[in-house]
Amino acid sequence: MSARAPKELRLALPPCLLNRTFASPNASGSGNTGARGPGAGGSGTCITQVGQQLFQSFSSTLVLIVLVTLIFCLIVLSLSTFHIHKRRMKKRKMQRAQEEYERDHCSGSRGGGGLPRPGRQAPTHTKETRLERQPRDSPFCAPSNASSSSSSSPGLLCQGPCAPPPPPPASSPQGAHAASSCLDTAGEGLLQTVVLS
């Protein structure tokens, strides 16, 4: 672990700081005084190098942060626009449905004001059939009118529904008596023929 730490430090620190930290301590006095001269001049360059490295690292992190924020903002904007568009579409659909319902309701109330509803059509139909049956049963054409029309214009028929033909006239009691007497005489003749045979 102790050997790895200085390696990491060497990689992290710039070369000027590495030269200063890892310089040999067994230098002579003249050598130290001679080294101080260029060291004082090289300290400015070392600071600039460190600043450049820090600025590069900071700028790279800033660029990454800006990119991440931009991507996040784009995602948020896309989601917000999608939700807003979805809400608008729902509102439009609701408005269209309401308009169609109002149109249908208004047209039904205007056009179907005098007409009966479909549930009430059956009784009106039965009433109509009853009304149709009544004029058929009630005689509009009297026999006197029929006779006069037939005498005046035999080719023309009676207008309107005419009454059914009258039933045959009932036989009078005299006719019934005559028929019974005829039957009696016929029966007596049959009996005489049977007896003679």
Swiss-Prot record:
InterPro entries registered for this protein in UniProt: C11orf87 (IPR037670)
Composition skew (Pro residues), residue ranges: 162-171
Subcellular compartments: Membrane
UniProt region (Disordered), positions on chain: 94-180
Residues in the signal sequence: 1-23
Keyword Transmembrane helix: yes
Compositionally skewed regions (Low complexity) per UniProt: 147-161
Highest taxon of the lineage: Eukaryota
Membrane topology (Extracellular): 24-61
Keywords: Glycoprotein, Membrane, Signal, Transmembrane, Transmembrane helix
GO cellular component: membrane
Membrane topology, record value: Single-pass type I membrane protein
Glycosylation sites: 19, 26
Main localization (coarse): membrane
Compositionally biased residues, Basic and acidic residues: 96-107, 125-136
Side Cytoplasmic, residues: 83-197
Chain ranges passing through the membrane: 62-82
Identification of the protein by name: Uncharacterized protein C11orf87 homolog
Source species: Macaca fascicularis
